[in-house]
A protein has these predicted regions:
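Short, conserved recognition motifs on repeat-domain binding surfaces
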Residues: 1-416
Length: 416
């Protein structure tokens, strides 16, 4: 491999998906490994010397590539055959590129007919035009884990996509059969990298009484090693029902439940747990097993941040449950919630039209909060205990009722 040494050069990336300009709609399904990268030399009369780095051992090449930002790694993969082989090698993706997962990235999308959006690099604090390999709607259930993201169409509940957004590799699973028509369903997803497997959980709730007090609950577990859905755990709940929020953390399934008794405000939300190692359903759905929420909540979300179960939600008013007075973050400590922080009022006001419905997603050290009505994204760093805004996204609102949403994930180069 030869590099031509000149006074200066530039990289031209025509049609690249990793672009700071308008997205290229002609690269659907082509992945993010850029094929059109060109090294453009300045046309001048100065003497140029060719320098070969082919004599360098592979481990030096790997160390050079592993120091690059993620977007630059994809571009470098197209410079020469050797670098392309290294970037795609299992050794590089499993070892040298582990630093890529230190900070989660955020993908923002809208109610568009195209699978396009913007991807936020939290390390470089930069947005990229980005495209998923399939169309995702804001009503879909989305669950990330270790670089992979699970998507479930909540309208049809027929298919689940397991995708690496960075490499655009994905596989599709059929949903397990349901014993009835589910009113609510919750998706959870967990990757075990040491054993190269993943687990999917779907919790379904079906109405069992006209007064909405009794609910039939089914828990479906998929093991990728066996490539099969286990027999569902079935049971009933009185006075509580699962919603659309669940999480897997350290082989424990956490399910956010809602009180179905009238005039209940303070304890409107709760949490139940199910051990995925023992598969013992006894007592899981009993009322005495419910862990009360820290306060009246709206738009509660569970997420795994710093290897802990974290709850993010709007802090409701006791007299007006649909109105929030702020947004809080809590960590589960045993069977109690410990408050970490509340969003400062200046940031609440910065959202403008932030109401009781908003999106939140977290992983690694970062928690992302976004209003469904706009593109502003606020980040809370659990490590530094600081709030800060994302750089302004170039996505614009095209009509008044347009809905924006997003999710975070760890950028990785390998599928498993």
């Amino acid at each position: 491999m030869l590099f031509w040494v000149t006074d200066s050069f530039s990289l031209s990336v025509p049609g690249a998906s990793w672009s700071d300009d308008e997205s290229d709609t002609n690269r659907k399904g082509s992945g993010v490994f850029l094929l059109n990268l060109e090294l453009i030399e300045n046309d001048n009369n100065q003497e140029e010397n060719s320098v070969s780095i082919d004599i360098l051992p592979d481990d030096i090449h790997e160390r050079i590539l592993s120091r690059l930002p993620l977007s630059a790694i994809f571009k470098a993969a197209c410079v020469c055959k050797k670098w392309n082989q290294i970037v795609h090698s299992k050794k590089f993706t499993l070892t040298d590129a582990n630093f890529l997962s230190e900070k989660t990235w955020y993908f923002m999308f809208t109610s568009s007919a195209e699978p396009v959006g913007y991807l936020y690099d939290s390390g470089l604090r930069k947005w990229y035009n980005f495209e998923l390999p399939f169309l995702v709607h804001h009503t879909w259930k989305i669950a990330p884990s270790c670089g992979l993201v699970s998507f479930m169409d909540d309208e049809t509940c027929k298919k689940i996509h397991i995708c690496n957004p960075i490499t655009r590799e994905y596989e599709t699973l059929k949903n397990p059969p349901s014993p009835g028509f589910p009113v609510y369903s919750a998706l959870a997803f967990s990757v075990d990298q040491s054993n190269s497997k993943y687990t999917i959980s779907i919790v379904r709730a079906m109405q069992a009484s006209e007064d909405f007090l009794s609910w039939l609950v089914s828990i479906h577990i998929y093991n990728s090693k066996e490539k099969t859905w286990l027999p569902p755990v079935m049971g009933g709940m009185e006075g509580w029902r699962p919603g659309d929020v669940s999480l897997i953390c350290d082989n424990i399934l956490y399910i956010l439940v809602f009180c179905t008794r009238p005039n209940e405000v303070q304890n409107f939300h709760g949490l139940i747990t199910y051990n995925l190692e023992t598969f013992n359903p006894i007592g899981v759905l009993k009322e005495e097993s419910v862990i009360s929420a820290p306060c009246a909540l709206t738009c509660g979300r569970l997420m795994k941040v710093q290897r802990q179960v974290v709850l993010v939600g709007g802090i409701g008013r006791a007299d007006r449950p649909g109105v929030i007075k702020g947004i809080g973050i809590w960590v589960l400590n045993g069977k109690e919630w410990k408050e970490v922080t509340r969003m400062p009022q200046k940031f609440v006001q910065g959202f403008g039209e932030l109401d009781d419905v908003f999106a939140s997603s977290g992983g690694g050290d970062l928690i992302y909060i976004q209003s469904y009505g706009g593109t502003a994204v606020l980040i809370y760093d659990m490590d530094t205990r600081q709030w800060f805004w994302c750089q302004k996204c170039q996505m614009h609102k095209k009509f008044p009722l347009e809905i924006f949403s997003g999710f975070c994930f760890e950028p990785r180069l390998q599928f498993m």
